[in-house]
UniProtKB/Swiss-Prot annotation:
Domain WW: 9-44
Origin: domain of life: Eukaryota
Organism: Schizosaccharomyces pombe (strain 972 / ATCC 24843) (Fission yeast)
GO cellular component terms listed in the entry, alphabetical order: nucleus
Gene3D superfamilies listed in its UniProt record: 2.20.70.10
Annotated spans, Disordered: 115-143
Name of the protein this chain belongs to: WW domain-containing protein C660.05
Length: 143
């Protein structure tokens, strides 16, 4: 897997790396050891065009739901996997892992609709807001 990086328009020591999942650049200050990648450019309002040959897709307002109505985990895992697999080197430069998924009006809501509970177990999961309640009765059985 190849990685697209550029230094165009960036301050000395900064590199922009394209994330194909979010169709956006993330930025790293290479002058500091252990610098964390970030979605915000080091210069406010900086615009770097997408890599050559990139086809961009218009942002979809909501995460697609499966047939049972739950939100798909595929989109969130896709960004993680792309970042994890981006360990290849392009033109002798170091490739970086993407930061956590972007937030804000440019990128839309986070996967899971703001649910901050555990992502495992029989009743949690993505979109698992029921907490084990059956039929809207609070899990107390028949009355």
């Amino acid at each position: 897997m190849s990685v697209y990086q550029t230094y165009k328009g960036l301050p000395a020591g900064w590199v922009a790396q394209w994330d194909p999942t979010y169709q956006a650049y993330f930025y790293i200050n290479e002058t500091f050891e252990g610098a964390q990648p970030q979605w915000e450019p080091p210069i406010p309002g900086l615009h770097i065009p997408p890599p050559p040959g990139t086809t961009t897709v218009v942002y979809q307002k909501d995460v697609p739901r499966s047939s049972d109505g739950s939100r798909s985990m595929t989109a969130g895992l896709g960004g993680f996997m792309v970042g994890a697999l981006a360990g290849s080197v392009l033109r002798g430069h170091r490739a970086y892992y993407a930061p956590p998924p972007p937030r804000g009006p440019l990128f839309g809501p986070r996967i899971g609709g703001g649910h901050h509970g555990p992502l495992h177990g029989p009743h949690g999961g993505f979109g698992g807001r029921g907490g084990g309640r059956m039929g809207g009765r609070g899990g107390r059985g028949r009355r």
